[in-house]
């Protein structure tokens, strides 16, 4: 989960600090007992990058934990990540946490279809293709909208699921709640809960956002 986003956000923040000659910049990095970066904060006069790992839960994303599910580490050695990039009016935030349960994916899917309902219509996706109806939320979100934001390219592998993974999605193109299913491990169902807040699309003529 978040293996690409966490690494790229950290690199971006450090690069910006170096580009600014460190004038007025503040860089702070905390590591865990294993030497892994746990928090990274880069603040500059024109914006900043904050990366926090293993500090959020499903509740922070506005969702319940599936009964009996436990948070698990992924290939990035973190159970969760909270990445926030803000530069003036341009802001991107990605929050994600991985869980596993011995129950079937069908049971987990049914649970989160109900849970995501608080955010409006829920669509079921296999990769970029919808399964059943609705195929689009009332706010215009589709299965193919993961990488269609004009200001940032984003795909499923950035938060831990695969290219053709099963996903449940709710919300709008800019504000999405996602339950993405990862490859099963040791006979257990693995899934990631994700909240995406993407940058507004700027109107070049007026300078206003959507």
Model-derived segments and spans:
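Sec-dependent bacterial lipoprotein signal peptides
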Residues: 1-23
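An acidic-aromatic pocket/loop used at catalytic or ligand-binding sites
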Residues: 25-210
């Amino acid at each position: 989960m978040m293996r690409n986003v966490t690494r790229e956000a950290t690199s971006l923040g450090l690069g910006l600090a170096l580009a600014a000659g460190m004038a007025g910049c503040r860089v702070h990095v905390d590591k865990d007992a294993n030497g892994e970066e746990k928090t990274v904060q880069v603040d500059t006069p024109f914006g900043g990058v904050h990366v926090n790992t293993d500090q959020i839960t499903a509740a922070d994303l506005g969702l319940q934990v599936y009964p009996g599910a436990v948070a698990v580490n992924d290939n990035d050695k973190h159970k969760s990540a909270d990445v926030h990039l803000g530069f003036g009016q341009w802001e991107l935030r990605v929050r994600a946490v991985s869980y596993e349960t011995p129950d079937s994916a069908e049971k987990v899917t049914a649970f989160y279809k109900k849970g995501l309902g608080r955010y409006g219509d829920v669509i079921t996706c296999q990769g970029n293709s919808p399964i059943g109806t609705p195929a689009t939320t009332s706010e215009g979100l589709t299965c193919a909208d993961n990488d269609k934001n004009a200001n940032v390219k984003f795909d499923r592998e950035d938060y831990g699921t695969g290219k053709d993974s099963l996903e449940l999605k709710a919300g709008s193109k800019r504000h999405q709640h996602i339950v993405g299913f990862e490859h099963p491990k040791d006979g257990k169902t693995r899934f990631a809960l994700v909240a995406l807040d993407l940058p507004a699309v700027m109107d070049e003529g007026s300078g206003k956002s959507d």
